[in-house]
UniProtKB/Swiss-Prot annotation:
Gene Ontology biological process terms from the UniProt entry: response to unfolded protein
CDD domains from the UniProt entry: bZIP_ATF4 (cd14692)
Protein name per Swiss-Prot or TrEMBL: Activating transcription factor of chaperone
Chief place of localization: nucleus
Record keywords: Activator, DNA-binding, Nucleus, Transcription, Transcription regulation, Unfolded protein response
Region called Disordered, residue ranges: 117-185
Length: 236
């Protein structure tokens, strides 16, 4: 938008100033200040409106322009008459169905279909819950196929628990056998030691008897030699 479209000519400015001055709602001092600001802004715009396109004015210039336009509009606009109380509330006439667009009926049909679908979905859980409550009373006896399938489903769990039990029982049996072998080994060692002790005791008794016999023979020989030496006169 060009600067000339945004700003009115000087004759319109003078006319706006006269209206602002004659308006009973605006005091003289603010009107003079507004006119002064408007003239400065208009002079700045007139100096630059023949130049090639340039950057937009700064925020201060935009603020002055908007403030001047608002003041001019409020001064030129006549006061709005007060509406009578009877016309304050107006009844809006309903739009006939024939004047509705074609797509609106399709939307209504789609909404009704969605409502019916939702109502059927809400009613189906109640039906399923009632049938579930009534099913235990009239439930048929379990068939052999279902029992076989239950056994098939429970078989893997049993197979999983069996190896653990078998491993534990095998471990206990191994420990028991190892303890039995250890006791048997110790018992055999004790028996061997007892036999060796018995043989050693027998050997000891035999050696003791031989020792006593030898001592007795030595005493007997000593006595004979003494008698012999006495007989020869070698010993007094």
């Amino acid at each position: 938008m060009s600067c000339r479209a945004m700003v009115s000519p000087p004759s319109r400015t003078a006319r706006a100033g006269a209206v602002l001055a004659s308006s009973p709602f605006v005091t003289s001092q603010p009107t003079e200040e507004l006119l002064r600001e408007f003239e400065t802004v208009y002079g700045a715009v007139e100096l630059t409106h023949l130049t090639p396109p340039q950057s937009p004015p700064g925020p201060a210039t935009q603020l002055l322009l908007s403030y001047a336009q608002q003041a001019q509009c409020t001064a030129l606009a006549p006061p709005a008459p007060l509406a009578p109380p009877q016309e304050a509330w107006q009844i809006v006439a309903p739009v006939p169905v024939n004047q509705l667009p074609e797509g609106y009926e399709c939307d209504l049909d789609a909404v009704e279909e969605l409502v019916r679908h939702r109502a059927s979905q809400l009613a189906s859980p109640q039906h399923s819950s009632s049938s579930a409550n009534a099913s235990p009373r009239s439930s048929p006896p379990p068939s052999p196929r279902s029992s076989s399938t239950d056994e098939d489903w429970s078989a893997p769990s049993r197979l999983k628990t069996r190896p653990v039990d078998d491993r534990r029982s095998r471990k206990k049996e191994q420990n028991k056998n190892a303890a039995t072998r250890y006791r048997q080994k110790k018992k055999a060692e004790v028996e061997v030691l007892l036999k060796e002790e018995q043989t050693l005791r027998q050997r000891h008794t035999e050696l003791g008897e031989k020792c006593s016999d030898l001592q007795r023979e030595i005493r007997y020989l000593k006595a004979l030699m003494r008698d012999l030496f006495k007989a020869k006169g070698l010993i007094k």
